[in-house]
Amino acid sequence: MQHPPLDSIRNIGIISHIDAGKTTVSERILFYTGETHKIGEVHDGEAVMDWMPQEQERGITITSTATVCRWGAWWINLIDTPGHIDFTIEVERSLRALDGAVAIFSAVEGVQPQSESVWRQADRYQVPRICFINKMDRVGADYRETLRQMEEKLGARPVLLQLPVGVEASFAGVVDLIAGEFLTFSEADQGSTVERHPIPAEIAGEAMAVREELIEAAADFDDAILADFLEGTAIAAERIRAAIRKGTIACRIVPVFLGTALRNRGIQPLLDAVAAYLPSPRDIPPVTGQRPDGEAVDSLPCDPAGPLCALAFKVQADEGRKLTYLRIYSGTVKAGGALWNSNRGCFEKAARLFRMHAHKREPIDEALAGDIVAAIGLKEVLTGDTLCDPAHKVLLSGLTVPEPVVALAVEPRGVDDRDKLLPALEKLQWEDPTFRVHEDEETGQTILTGMGELHLEVVTDRLGREFGVQVKTGRPQVVYRETITRPAERQEVFRTEFEGKVQGGEVHLRLAPLHRGEGVRIVVPPAEVLGITRELHTALTESLTRGASTGCVTGYPLTDLEVRVITVPVEQGVTTEGGVRAAAGRGLMRAARDGAPTLLEPLMDLEIITPTEYAGKVLGSVQQKRGRVEGIITQGNTEAIRALVPLAEMFGYMTELRSATKGRGGFTMEFSRFDQAPASVLQQFGLA
């Protein structure tokens, strides 16, 4: 493929709640752009974008998948992301690298919990979005209710650019409100032919009224449109589109489109909208970062001739090597070229470059600013690392990585498995920053931690399939957090004798509790203020950071406390880096013990969908689980129950809910926050 002009590139992601139809939409995009010659269906396990065996068997997306397709003059780098909360890091890192997104909502279920979560992630990275309300052919489809929920739950300003013709089973197509046409999609060729007709008389009045609302929204971004609208002057379609594009890129409005991907209706207008309203790499603000000395650098515009700056937003294990996905923000990467890894402080070599088509690869010689590509040969790289020109070193901000909340003990089944287990787990950790591994000091067991039961279930399944490692697993356990309840202070002195010479370190620490959700704040004054060398300063900071990952009583990570370094007395000929590390680590643990430690447990935002006849039984179950009901919404013959529930009470809940609702209920949940654990839990750890 010849490299396209920057203005014609669209780097986009598909985001939504699980089962809203992301992958079904992605498969139609590939088909209508000519990248595939057959539509792969998720329910048949044939989706091109869901290529992992676990995805095909479960009918869900587990890992974000990248591909490239052409739509007219436009070049679309497309990433399909998971909708299940356990794989939220896949959404996080994709949004970090993308310029725009298509948010998919079900016209039946509306804005669901994980939809809210991914929307907040997109807000955090200021990613412009358009919206596709899917499943318009389903019984109970109500796009107006979905629009209302977008406003209420997401704080979005949706702008309707289409109207449906027909509802539920009679859904026939959409009215393009800007062009003033009724669009249908031929069933004879799986929707490939888009036919244009006059707007049906029965909805012409509604179409005119909604078009006026659309023009009013466009007028917020073009004063001339407002003047012409008030004077009754005709406004050209291209002027309206330009104004809508301006508002979309500014993240002030969200254009909304309608359709049913499974029935092959509405995808081509969505592709037109990707080209018309979502930004090119040139439209997004220039990337900024820091120099190695901490000073801010000038912004780096998206220019292939500029200094190289790229983000490694995903690392995947590939036959023992690392396959690294790169977003090129500035400059050019050549196959075989040397790069500087700002996070690891070392040179790397991109031996080979590829354009990815799901799990298939197209070798390329170079990648330019605006590209999303993959590289083999980067040995030290991890997710979130910055790769740049050695002559223009820069460090970009990394990713927001959520902390794991579920733990699982594993042990190898046989001797051969024991030798292969840790190397396999290391490779899986390359891929997933939310997956952690450690050894229980008391039992010697290998402990896996992750975002949920499904997350760890997929990990153990991959151990067997991809690495040939068979393991026995324990029951999932909650990952608690330790914190302190009162201030504490410690002057820690460490001394040891090595080859007849006394060595050591001394650190004065002050700890204070923080509000819930503030995490760990480590305050270390600059080296010159403390009167220590840069090497001692680094040793001190690293020791405190490492120490905070292990609590003083239970071994669970510390959270919601401030660790402040007051002084670091230096004794000439005695103070060493190792001594300072030991004093800092031991001082932190002892100070935390003096701070009246306690445990925090993870609380989950839970949404249960149940037939009304079983709602009473379900509510009783939630209350028995120490849950706090926060809202109940009636939707026809079903109830949507929202509650805050401790994760410890939720293991195996799907089986319980199915039994209570005769298989008709379902639920979703996502992490909310850590809060005080009850006395029964504290007693287990000797803290009550």
Swiss-Prot record:
Function text: Catalyzes the GTP-dependent ribosomal translocation step during translation elongation. During this step, the ribosome changes from the pre-translocational (PRE) to the post-translocational (POST) state as the newly formed A-site-bound peptidyl-tRNA and P-site-bound deacylated tRNA move to the P and E sites, respectively. Catalyzes the coordinated movement of the two tRNA molecules, the mRNA and conformational changes in the ribosome.
GO cellular component terms, A-Z: cytoplasm
Subcellular location: Cytoplasm
Name of the protein described by the UniProt record: Elongation factor G 2
InterPro entries referenced in this protein's UniProt entry, alphabetically: EFG_II (IPR041095), EFG_III (IPR009022), EFG_III/V (IPR035647), EFG_V (IPR035649), EFG_V-like (IPR000640), EFTu-like_2 (IPR004161), G_TR_CS (IPR031157), P-loop_NTPase (IPR027417)
Domain tr-type G: 7-282
Family to which the UniProt record says this protein belongs: Belongs to the TRAFAC class translation factor GTPase superfamily. Classic translation factor GTPase family. EF-G/EF-2 subfamily.
GO BP terms, alphabetized: ribosome disassembly
PANTHER family linked to this entry: RIBOSOME-RELEASING FACTOR 2, MITOCHONDRIAL, TRANSLATION ELONGATION FACTOR G-RELATED
SUPFAM superfamilies, A to Z: EF-G C-terminal domain-like, P-loop containing nucleoside triphosphate hydrolases, Ribosomal protein S5 domain 2-like, Translation proteins
Main location: cytoplasm
Alphabetized Pfam families for the sequence: EFG_C, EFG_III, EFG_IV, GTP_EFTU, GTP_EFTU_D2
Keywords from the UniProt entry: Cytoplasm, Elongation factor, GTP-binding, Nucleotide-binding, Protein biosynthesis
GO molecular-function term, one example from the UniProt record: GTPase activity
Source species of the chain: Geobacter metallireducens (strain ATCC 53774 / DSM 7210 / GS-15)
PROSITE patterns: G_TR_1, G_TR_2
Amino acids binding GTP: 16-23, 80-84, 134-137
